Amino acid sequence: MNKLFLILLLIFSHEVFSQTSAEVLQSKLNAIQTMTANFSQIVKAKNREVSRSSGSMALQRPGRFRWQTKDPLEQLIVADGQKMWIYDVDLEQVTVKNQEKGLGGTAALFLSGYDETLTHDFDVSEKQKGKLTVFDLKSKSAKENFQRIKLIFSQSTLIGLELYDQLGQITDVKLVQIKSNPKLPAKLFQFKPPKGVDVVKQ
C-alpha cells in the first residue's frame, strides 16, 4: 500500500516532458489541482491474486495527499507537503517520515513534483483503448521500484492505474466516484496521532 501511495504522489509532477505523448499526459495532470475518489486495488503475482483492498483518497497539489484503506485492514496515509504519516490502526502504530525522504529514491514523485529528474526516467507512449486513453510509462532504469506504469484516462479523468514492480507483481487500481477540482478542507491533509499509539520517526 505504501508503494501505491508513493506512485500516486508521483503522478502530478510539474516537470515538462519533451515527447508528444508525455506532453499530452502532462497537460491532463496539470488540469487536476484537487481530486477525490474511492478506490479498489488488486495485487497479482504470476497470474494469481495476492491481495485485495479498497478505500478512499484525496489529493491537493502540490504534495498533499490522503489515502485511506478501509478493507481488509484499516490504514491511513497522510502527506502535508512536508511530512508523511502512516497510521496502521490494527498495530496502533504511526510512522512519521519527512515527505521527501519518504518519497525519494522510488518512482515516487510523479504526483507531487519534488523530484525534477523523475520525468526523464520513463519513456511515455499513448494509445486509445475504445473511449479510454492509456499512457504507458516504461522505466529507463532496471533499478526503479516500478518498471512500468499505466495511467488510464476517460477524457480528462484519471480512472485507473496499473503498476508493474521489480518482483513481477502487478497492482491494478480502479477509481470510482471521482470528483475533479473540488474545494477540499485543509484538515484532510493534517494528522494528529491518537492517544496511546506508538509513534515511530524515520
UniProtKB/Swiss-Prot annotation:
<feature type="signal peptide">
    <location>
        <begin position="1"/>
        <end position="18"/>
    </location>
</feature>
<dbReference type="GO" id="GO:0044874">
    <property type="term" value="P:lipoprotein localization to outer membrane"/>
</dbReference>
<dbReference type="GO" id="GO:0042953">
    <property type="term" value="P:lipoprotein transport"/>
</dbReference>
<dbReference type="InterPro" id="IPR018323">
    <property type="entry name" value="OM_lipoprot_carrier_LolA_Pbac"/>
</dbReference>
<keyword id="KW-0574">Periplasm</keyword>
<keyword id="KW-0732">Signal</keyword>
<dbReference type="InterPro" id="IPR029046">
    <property type="entry name" value="LolA/LolB/LppX"/>
</dbReference>
<comment type="function">
    <text>Participates in the translocation of lipoproteins from the inner membrane to the outer membrane. Only forms a complex with a lipoprotein if the residue after the N-terminal Cys is not an aspartate (The Asp acts as a targeting signal to indicate that the lipoprotein should stay in the inner membrane).</text>
</comment>
<dbReference type="GO" id="GO:0030288">
    <property type="term" value="C:outer membrane-bounded periplasmic space"/>
</dbReference>
<keyword id="KW-0653">Protein transport</keyword>
<keyword id="KW-0143">Chaperone</keyword>
<dbReference type="InterPro" id="IPR004564">
    <property type="entry name" value="OM_lipoprot_carrier_LolA-like"/>
</dbReference>
<protein>
    <recommendedName>
        <fullName>Outer-membrane lipoprotein carrier protein</fullName>
    </recommendedName>
</protein>
<dbReference type="Pfam" id="PF03548">
    <property type="entry name" value="LolA"/>
</dbReference>
<keyword id="KW-0813">Transport</keyword>
<comment type="subunit">
    <text>Monomer.</text>
</comment>
<comment type="similarity">
    <text>Belongs to the LolA family.</text>
</comment>
